[in-house]
Amino acid sequence: MQLIDEVDTDQEDGPLGKRRISSTMHMATMFAALGGLLFGFHTGGISSAMVAIKQKIQLDHFWQELLVSITVGVAALSSLVGGALADCFGRKFVIRCAGFIFLLGSILFIGATDKTSLLISRIIIGLATGLTCSSVPLYIAECSPAHSRGFLVSMNSVFITGGNFISNFLCAAFGSYSGNGWRYYQVTSIATELYCLYAFAFACVPALLQVIFFHFLPESPLWYLDHGRVLDARDALKRLRPNLLDANKEYELIKARNDRDEQMFLEKGRPSIWTMLKSLHYIGIFMLGMSMFMFQQICGINAVLYYSATIIQMAGVETVGISLWLAAASSGLYFICTIVSLLLVERFRRRLLMLGSLLMVFISLIIIASGFHLIANSSPEITIHDETTQSTVCGGFLTCESCVNSQRCGFCYENRVDKNGSCLPTTDDTFQYSAVGKCSQEDNTFGPAIWAPEWCPSEYAWIPIVGLLAYLISFAPGLGMMPWVVNAELYPRWLRSIGVSLATTANFLFNLIVTLPFLSTVDLLGKSGTFYLFTFFTLCALVTFFLFLPETSGRHLLSPEEIQWRLYSFQQKPFNSSSHSSNSNFRYMKIRAHNRQFYNEDEESSE
């Protein structure tokens, strides 16, 4: 029995100030999550930027997919080394390095004037993204108290969606400036413009704040323990916990479990990645962590976010400005839903949130796919056949849908009830005009005609948009947050960094697999077919997690062996520490005035 003396008359906080979070812990979470904000800003915002960029710089589907996905591909590679760097040099070091690289990437974007310079800046941003995503959730989880870990780790998701919303909003707001609005929100080129300076300040200030102020925040206490710096671990806990009693109690807990594990390692040898491959339990942990991010991506979230403005245009919204504002509104809704989800993450079990989210996402995707199916079936016919296009590929199409599915053609129509229109070839240097006919730049009759290079007018355009909004609302509390939270809780200490790193790599790899060929997949399967495919993957995820997903809430990070699998066969563990746990049940006596209260640590941590 270990005795901890305290005189405390504050009865409302419960045992050991159970529900309080220190100001330092809040600051550590916020400044770490700035990396998530920059991640969301630079990746999600490309959705709206792409609509404006392709108006100024001729970009076919390949270049659009490349500029969107190159950041994700580089992030997948850098996240592989992010875990090793975080283990070697510390979580703080990697997070600050990522902030500096984000700053460099933003500055390089300033001079972007063509495809190549845009591509280089996106590669630099991808490097920072991978380092951020492999270290920030790890740092927040290891610094957080068990009772608020889900809430605090979820702040990273809030900042990611917040960055996404801000970038979409700025792109919509500046999108009308001579076709160069995409420059101003990401800071490029004409630095003499006042609004460009404001945008530059926003893009770079979060990175600067993270690099500077993160220096004064504590390192992860568990990282200190892993490197034998026990006094530093104790000092870090004193700064991160609301009072000395909480810090001392948690220090004794993690020190005892650390000593127990070290004794076990001395007797059985230190575990390695090969240890994981010999046990169904650790294989199950590893596969579950990866599958959560895999399904997060193949259910379509980043395809929807990255191409939201394009999807809204595909639904039949006529003007670029309206589609940009609708994309900003959809990302704003997702941001709000993520904030609301913070209220749910510690009130409901992780498993319940995940399964409920998947069910609603499944229904939402059916609505989107059905809407696009109705739009395709009601596509306007080609009623005006331009003599100059009869010998071209555009002259052979009979409906608007078949016309716009070809990258070389677009639909030119009069904005009337009957939607009389023709299929005309696009130009080589811009999507704004057709090469010939009423929608060409030279034709004097361009005014009353509308040029639709990638979409068709339809009375059903509202259905996919409603489904898109329902999808974002449904996705946020489960698939949006839970993969980050559960991955931070699944792994034992010796597997945590590599586990989070590999799971993050899986996240980016499947992100790349989905987003890189997204527009090409739409060309191949059609809009409705693409979203029916996402619907099928969501159903697979629902079945998989119903069968295999365990509950991880309320567990201490040093006791992942407490996880109860849905299938008993996964309970086998090669490193069962029960034989070394004679000292694992510590009882703490808290003296409060004249009363004595006894607390069993294992009971408290399982609440």
Feature locations, PLM:
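Short, well-structured alpha-helical segments
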Residues: 247-262
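Transmembrane-helix signature of 12-pass secondary carriers
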Residues: 2-238, 262-415, 420-607
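Short arginine-rich
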Residues: 242-249, 563
